[in-house]
């Protein structure tokens, strides 16, 4: 399977909590899209059986969340962390054989990336250091285009990783269609003029 030069590797993780020192991964899902946000494959999902101490550390909120989603019932049949890391990386390698070429994408992706860096360092190391975080665009839309923000597609993922990823891809597609300049975009001359105007307006602050 050939690699696409503009691939995005979308990853969503479900954890026992958000404390990087105590909590562990429960579920990891990967969806690969092209530059146009079209999924190249249905995606890959794996459930992990964490240490018992991590399960015992789960608070009521997280326990209820994973119970309602059905994830809690799948954990005992989950694979080891080492097996999960191997399978996740093997899946990504089908589309991204070269390291450090494809950015990680997702929603509030910093949290997922922190857990990947700790528990799946080979996966994190294979991805480009840059990330595409849909929540950044959401926050800018809230400030600059509030009507766009309030009309964004409703999310109903139920805290399962695959549904969460697909909703994040859909959300970015929405922002792209309503906020970003439509194809074919500005000409080089228009972009140069906008760049010069911006530099001039910031000249007193950026020297």
Model-predicted segments: where are they?
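Short, well-ordered beta-to-alpha junction loops that form the rim of enzyme active sites
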Residues: 105-110
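Acidic active-site catalytic centers that drive phospho-/nucleotidyl reactions
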Residues: 12-14, 34, 112, 133, ...
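Substrate-recognition/cap helix-loop segment adjacent to the acidic, metal-dependent catalytic center
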Residues: 92-96, 111-129
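HAD-like aspartate-dependent phosphatase fold
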Residues: 65, 88, 97-100, 113-114, ...
């Amino acid at each position: 399977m050939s690699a696409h030069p503009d691939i995005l590797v979308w990853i969503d993780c479900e954890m026992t909590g958000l404390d990087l020192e105590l909590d562990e991964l429960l579920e990891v899902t990967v969806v690969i899209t092209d530059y146009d946000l079209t999924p190249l494959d249905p995606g890959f999902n794996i459930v992990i059986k964490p240490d018992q101490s991590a399960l015992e550390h789960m608070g009521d909120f997280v326990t209820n969340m994973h119970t309602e989603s059905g994830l809690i019932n799948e954990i005992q049949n989950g694979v080891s962390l080492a097996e999960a890391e191997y399978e996740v990386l093997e899946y990504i390698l089908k589309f991204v054989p070269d390291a450090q070429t494809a950015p990680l994408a997702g929603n509030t992706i910093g949290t997922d990336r922190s857990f990947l860096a700790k528990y799946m360092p080979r996966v994190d190391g294979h991805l480009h250091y840059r990330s595409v975080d849909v929540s950044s665009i959401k926050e800018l839309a809230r400030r600059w285009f509030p009507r766009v923000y309030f009309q964004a597609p409703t999310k109903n993922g139920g805290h399962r990783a695959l549904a969460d990823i697909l909703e994040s891809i859909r959300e970015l597609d929405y922002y792209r269609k309503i906020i970003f300049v439509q194809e074919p975009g500005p000409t080089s001359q228009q972009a140069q003029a906008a760049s010069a105007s911006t530099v001039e307006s910031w000249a007193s602050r950026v020297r």
